[in-house]
């Protein structure tokens, strides 16, 4: 059974704070304030601090209750540090001992460590200690506010009813961890009863967890199954398969009651389009559902399954569309046909425009689209605006829908559209979108954006499924500033089951690519040192071991830039071929250091931290602009042919392509999206009057007047929360 401490772990990870301990009962003594202060100081060592409301609530609790809450919170905060503290890199006094060694010694040490299956290390001075970390230039500590017990349900409802598929980690958290608990699911169903679920993938995952309950038909989402593809996704979810349908699902054997429920849902949907689009998948599903057993009840189901099994061609809207898209294209007829399905029009707007013979035809096509675009899903309009904003960028990446799908640079061979046309299309859709988002407002709403969040540099995640879980989860192309410090330390930790043969254990590699206009250098296991860049690798761990393994790469920002390298890309590669999702625990990131003080892993200096959980064996984390001192999120796996010796050198071209793609993006920012949703941006003096505040520092916005309602505060890194602000109907 889940406890409040389990809920706190989730709300803490999503920037929503924790539920504080209950106040001491009358006659019971509250904890002494000095204990709470000491606990808060301990948190600061790891880059966190209690917000005022949480601190005050802890001071009112009994000692034992406070200690339980504090211990659970401390476990969350110190999880990474505890994992890494059990191990050391190959060079125990890194970076000093490794930097003093010559290149031959570095190679020999790596080799000897490999021969001993990770046991042997070079001699080191056990009495040597690191000077205490200089805390004068650390990143701002992350505040932990108090939240109520309802917050975990708000998070779950916002995640499920959001307008976008959840990332694998978010989906696992909601549907596997939380909804695995019977009591939690019952409470959640009560709150979800009147809610509709616009995203069909989330609908399939949610219903698959509750379909065995007799009361599930009382849920409003029961009426959200509109097409046969929706039911196909549900069958995939019930079989623990990919609901994106990027891979053909393998259906399990369904119980008789489940077969009847699936067929009943299917009977009342539009079937032709889905069956024509996924014929093989429906053949396999039919083999599990046995529609012939229910032919007297679900006649339409039986007829369509019979057609698909016998190879009968099904005439659909799409079949007519395919005919109209054949060369030569009549843009007028095509756009007229597309108006019948606005969503399809959005998907094919670019095709229709580039096949127009003159500007007047373009005007007609665009006019027709604008006339129907208000009925299109808002998130699709966001993606369409981003498409036309970035259409003429030099580098384009194609990414699959599957978990961990690799991205590949495209050589585009399509008819051009002028930049003026692209800007015009994006602007016209933008003007329609803000009207859609504000359509149900009875009065203008206002928002205050904390300038320290730099929301104008944070890309709005139009596809959260592709966003890796992180301390500050951000979409590809988002930019944040580096704090003071001249040395960057990339880090990688992993722990997994090596198997009986440590010679062939799990081998992950941390690498850094330095590149400028016409040159590149690499610091990785085969080139562990470059003195001109002040760069040093901590050694190549070749297996996980019983406690995990760690690798670091240090480099000097000034030296890199002075030697003509403007960018540094941080990458992780599974050399042994295991996917990140197969690890027991794996994460990577970057710290900002002064090069003189602190332990090897100092949580308070962590700038970005990414969880390695996807079905991928490679990740480009971030690229750092050494001139502007900006960290640009890349968060892409790059596609490349499989090589036994594949490394950062062989992947240089796709890595740089992924970084270039991220840096050139002109997609909608979080600030632009908030501007569409809210009629007024408030100035700093007026934040108390805001409908909502977007900030990662809730302590700055505390209302002292008890009669004044406190504005809702949402972190820009809380993706379900941001989606609810912009697309939700209850976002005051």
What are these regions (language model features)?
Residues 1-732:
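Intrinsic-disorder/low-complexity signal
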């Amino acid at each position: 059974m889940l406890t409040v401490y389990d809920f706190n772990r989730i709300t803490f990870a999503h920037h929503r704070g924790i539920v504080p301990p209950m106040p001491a009962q009358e006659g019971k003594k509250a904890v002494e304030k000095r204990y709470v202060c000491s606990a808060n100081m301990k948190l600061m060592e790891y880059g966190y601090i209690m917000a005022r409301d949480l601190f005050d609530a802890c001071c009112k609790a009994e000692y034992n209750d406070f200690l339980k809450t504090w211990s659970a919170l401390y476990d969350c905060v110190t999880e990474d540090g505890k994992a890494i503290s059990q191990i050391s890199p190959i060079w125990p006094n890194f970076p000093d001992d490794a930097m003093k060694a010559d290149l031959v010694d570095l190679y020999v040490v790596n080799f000897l460590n490999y021969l001993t299956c990770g046991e042997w290390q070079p001699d080191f001075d056990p009495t040597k200690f690191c000077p205490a970390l200089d805390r004068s230039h650390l990143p701002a500590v992350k505040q932990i506010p108090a939240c109520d017990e309802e917050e975990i349900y708000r998070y779950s409802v916002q995640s499920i009813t959001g307008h976008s598929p959840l990332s694998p980690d978010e989906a696992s958290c909601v549907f596997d961890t939380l909804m695995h608990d019977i009591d939690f699911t019952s409470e959640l169903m009560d709150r979800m009863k009147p809610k509709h679920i616009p995203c069909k993938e989330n609908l399939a995952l949610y219903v698959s967890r509750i379909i065995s309950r007799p009361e599930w038909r009382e849920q409003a989402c029961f009426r959200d199954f509109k097409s046969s593809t929706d039911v196909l996704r549900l069958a995939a979810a019930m079989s623990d398969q990919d609901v994106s349908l990027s891979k053909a699902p393998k259906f399990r054997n369904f119980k008789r009651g489940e077969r009847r429920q699936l067929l009943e849902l299917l009977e009342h949907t539009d079937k032709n389009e889905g069956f024509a689009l996924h014929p093989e998948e429906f053949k396999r599903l039919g083999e599990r559902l046995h529609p012939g057993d229910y032919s007297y009840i679900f006649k339409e189901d039986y007829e369509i399954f019979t057609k698909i099994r016998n190879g009968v061609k099904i005439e659909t809207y799409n079949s007519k569309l395919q005919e109209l898209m054949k060369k030569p294209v009549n843009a007028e007829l095509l756009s007229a046909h597309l108006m019948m399905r606005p969503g399809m029009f959005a998907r094919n707007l670019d095709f229709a425009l580039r096949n127009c013979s003159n500007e007047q035809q373009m005007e007609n096509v665009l006019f027709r689209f604008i006339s129907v675009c208000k009925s299109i899903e808002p998130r699709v309009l966001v993606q369409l605006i981003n498409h036309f904003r970035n259409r003429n960028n030099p580098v384009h990446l194609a990414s699959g829908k599957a978990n961990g799908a690799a991205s590949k640079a495209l050589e585009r061979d399509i008819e051009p559209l002028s930049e003026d046309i692209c800007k015009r299309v994006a602007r016209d859709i933008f003007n329609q979108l803000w009207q859609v988002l504000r359509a149900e407002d009875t009065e203008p709403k206002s928002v205050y954006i904390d300038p320290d969040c730099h929301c104008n540099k944070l890309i709005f995640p139009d596809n959260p499924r592709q966003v890796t879980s992180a301390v500050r989860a951000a979409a590809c192309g988002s930019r944040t500033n580096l704090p003071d410090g001249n040395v960057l330390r990339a880090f990688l930790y992993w722990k997994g089951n090596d198997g009986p043969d440590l010679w062939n254990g799990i081998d992950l590699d941390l690498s850094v690519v330095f590149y400028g206009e016409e040159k590149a250098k690499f610091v990785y296991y085969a080139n562990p040192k470059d003195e001109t860049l002040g760069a040093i690798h901590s050694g190549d761990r070749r297996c996980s071991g019983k406690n995990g393994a760690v690798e670091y790469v240090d480099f000097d920002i000034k030296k890199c830039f002075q030697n003509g390298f403007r960018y540094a890309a941080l990458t992780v590669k599974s050399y042994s071929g295991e996917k990140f999702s197969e690890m027991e625990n794996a994460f990577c990131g970057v710290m900002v250091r002064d090069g003189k003080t602190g332990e090897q892993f100092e949580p308070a200096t962590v700038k970005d931290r990414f969880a390695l959980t996807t079905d991928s064996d490679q990740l480009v984390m971030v690229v750092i602009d050494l001139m502007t001192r900006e960290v640009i999120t890349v968060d892409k796996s790059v596609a490349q042919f499989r090589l036994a010796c594949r490394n950062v050198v062989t992947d240089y071209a796709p890595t740089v392509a992924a970084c270039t793609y991220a840096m050139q993006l002109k997609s909608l920012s979080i600030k632009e999206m908030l501007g569409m949703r809210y009629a007024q941006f408030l100035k700093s003096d007026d934040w108390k009057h805001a409908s909502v505040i977007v900030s990662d520092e809730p302590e700055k916005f505390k209302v002292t007047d008890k009669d004044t309602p406190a504005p809702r505060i949402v972190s820009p890194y809380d993706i379900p929360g941001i989606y609810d602000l912009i697309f939700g109907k209850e976002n005051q």
